[in-house]
Regions:
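Short, small-residue-rich loop/turn micro-motifs
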Residues: 9, 28, 38, 148, ...
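Short beta-strand/turn micro-motifs composed of small residues
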Residues: 6-7, 65
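Short strand->helix junction
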Residues: 10, 38-39, 112, 153
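Cofactor-binding loop segments of dinucleotide-utilizing enzymes, especially the Rossmann-like FAD-
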Residues: 7-8, 36, 107-109
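N-terminal, positively charged, Ser/Thr/Ala/Gly-biased leader segments
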Residues: 1-4
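A glycine/threonine-rich phosphate-anchoring loop and its flanking beta-alpha core
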Residues: 82-173
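N-terminal small/polar loop signature for handling phosphorylated ligands or for N-terminal nucleophile
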Residues: 12, 16-84
Length: 173
């Protein structure tokens, strides 16, 4: 089996991704790294991820990061197993996908929007200049590993920002 490892460049820079890569190596799990993840993931991030996943020959996804990495992984996993939704814009709202996403293991590094356990994810439509809220019970990660050590490894400023993000989401509802 091969992992498709979705994370962002900051987690690579902070050395957090290296810890997961070390676990892959210790367990002889081949992986493909995908780090084209923006702070607010875009349609292009998902589309590029779908192409990279298909080219990699991976069997499952490991998403390390905050909501952005996990949301990107959710979008990739849904589109790969539901090719009728290759136009990522078609995922906006309540998507009528037929198949569960690629099995995904979510490793959150922030305590923000709980992307690792919800049916929601957000993708930015840069052309329309708007957030697409996507709702799909088929996109929930198969496994969520909430390790406080991952959260402690984040800069305090980022931890505070994700707390404010969670508060903002709660107020918006």
């Amino acid at each position: 089996k091969k992992a498709f490892f979705v994370t962002d460049k900051d987690l690579i820079k902070f050395g957090v991704a290296a810890e997961i890569i070390k676990v892959f190596g210790e367990n002889q799990i081949p992986y493909e790294l995908y780090s084209d993840v923006k702070a607010n993931p875009t349609i292009a991030n998902v589309q590029n991820g779908v192409a990279a996943y298909k080219a990699s020959g991976a069997d499952f996804i490991v998403a390390l990061g905050g909501g952005s990495s996990i949301d990107t992984a959710k979008g990739i996993g849904i589109v790969v197993n539901n090719p009728d939704f290759a136009d990522v814009k078609s995922l906006e709202g309540v998507a009528d996908t037929k198949h569960k996403a690629v099995p995904t293991f979510a490793l959150p590094t922030t305590a923000g929007t709980a992307a690792e356990v919800t049916i929601n994810y957000v993708i930015i439509d840069e052309d329309a200049r708007k957030k697409m809220v996507c709702v799909d019970p088929n996109d929930i990660p198969a496994v969520a590993i909430v390790d406080p050590e991952l959260m402690y490894s984040m800069p305090k400023r980022l931890t505070a920002a994700t707390g404010m993000d969670a508060l903002t989401h709660a107020i918006e509802i």
